[in-house]
């Protein structure tokens, strides 16, 4: 599309609107000055967070030269945050990788060799050799992959097919394990289905917003602009923010609360108690739509079995629960009184009571938002469940302006990591590998012999680190993430495992990240609009984009790498004789033939792609690969509450929210009149559960795995900042973003700094029981910790904060608690 006068006027009008929200929009005028007629524009979702903003991408002479917020995108309405403003520049870092690099010595692969350019043929030769060796010597459990919530939908789906069906290994896990796993398990326990029931439209209809461990002002700034607009345009709207430290979201808060780490569990039980004691329960809703259960307690911390904390746990890893009555639940939460909760949490009584009244008042529509503060938590699943309790008790759920909403941090943590089944325990559309019927469904759709997919849950992210160190996971492929920097406790398991001579580690990445430089083989990867893609955002909105430029040099998309690598294996090399006996026609065929040239994936011809439209993968393989993968995948969910629209619909729309039935998207799930799966007269049906009822869980406060003591006397919480995304592998290569926040700092209370004889701007050594780093003291600015807590972002590769963190996880979700460990400071 060409830049028109109408587009010019739209862009300038949007700038004025953005200024009021404290946001920026790159104007088309600046990007296209003097050459408007030669810029081609096309739509795409933003490459960064899970909000799913729509952008217009301007290309010229084979390069991205501009971007702007898409005025037709319902999510962001033409706005861009500061990261979105600079999207074009993430593609063109000076150190962009453009050919495979293998550690070599004397012309051969060597674990301690220097990175040396090789061809794709050579790269896949050594990869295939190492994967086949691991399979032959130890079987499918010796191979694995760590994927991403930044994969496109079809990349994640192809990875699931290759690992779980082809190589017969469930050792596939995404980096979304580190951010969204607790939300997944929380949804499944309470509702029997994953992902939020509401949508962003709730913002304009809610009377109150409660943020639980979510700094939306910096992490989801476009959504925050909509909340800000709602709050400032209606004086009756209330914003409450809960966190373990003050941050920018507190600036809008009517009720900002800083609580002692881990005590959010107690606060939610207090609110439930308040609702019951003040007769604010929607009893009719409970009777018709809710069951009560008491969950197992003292479930451990996901550490190695030899750890003293695991040995001491009475029910390590238990997801068990027993039925209970409403009266029994009432008695359970009665222990969480206002006085007790205020003392535990450090939040004043009047603020706690004001918060409870929002949920209890039947005339106030409440939306609860959370991200990592809940999920990265040793009781993260419980935290999710307890928040659902509040909405279920009051009936404030699945209707406009009311509901619990788990926000996501990656662009397709929902659409790819969760929906297509790239977790070690999952298959597409909420199915799981431990369920025989689910495995049979997948095997039938994938045309596999019965028994191909293993029933055993694979290794989750932290378990992969431990298995690498222990030498039981030997061939390992990391795609579209920087886990050596982003994962916990780098020194004890991950780095030793990656550098163990028994193991061969491959990293696919556009840049030489900390992870890439720790690998044995680096594969150069196409980015964003250098390929055709699809993401699924936090409100169940699936969005497509077309390839708009070519990748540099020999860089190839993750999809191409996965599908091309499958050609290196014959079925005889990876499947036992008893499987082949069921499908003798597969003898002599490759995994590519069985998985991707199977009559389904390859049935859409190249003629469906316009002749002038870039699509490198499709033309390399000779068919419309992306469409074939999507339509095969979509077959899992259609008719089962996960309905996706036909492939071609998404290239026309600015995204559609599933389930999409008869061309109509669903804004609010489980509610009669808005969800096609709820029949007339049912009012509400939580159809993920066999009886259609959600579950309220009785779950207590339990302490963190590690707390400050006499020696390590401070809490450490980690996270992000507005200017950088995750490990900074993209944003730190944008000069403007790097200058805005060039290095990580330690945010600390001024009195804590003073008592340690530390001054702002001085160097300080931060130490935990696992490692140390040197950083800079910051006593001012956007983040204001209380006494006893310090905060550090993890974007800085020169300050690996995850040298400090503990690899304790929620035992149910296996998600790491990056928010709570103990550290001490030493003056340098």
UniProtKB/Swiss-Prot annotation:
Cofactor requirements of the protein: [4Fe-4S] cluster; Mo-bis(molybdopterin guanine dinucleotide)
Record carries keyword 4Fe-4S: yes
UniProt keyword annotations, A-Z: 4Fe-4S, Electron transport, Iron, Iron-sulfur, Metal-binding, Molybdenum, Nitrate assimilation, Oxidoreductase, Periplasm, Signal, Transport
Post-translational modification: Predicted to be exported by the Tat system. The position of the signal peptide cleavage has not been experimentally proven.
EC number: 1.9.6.1
Gene Ontology MF, one: electron transfer activity
Residues at which [4Fe-4S] cluster binds: 46, 49, 53, 81
Entry annotated with the keyword Transport: yes
CDD domains linked to this entry: MopB_CT_Nitrate-R-NapA-like (cd02791), MopB_Nitrate-R-NapA-like (cd02754)
S-S bonds: none
Location of the 4Fe-4S Mo/W bis-MGD-type domain: 39-95
Catalytic reactions on record: 2 Fe(II)-[cytochrome] + nitrate + 2 H(+) = 2 Fe(III)-[cytochrome] + nitrite + H2O
Protein name, UniProt field: Periplasmic nitrate reductase
Organism: Serratia proteamaculans (strain 568)
Gene of this entry: napA
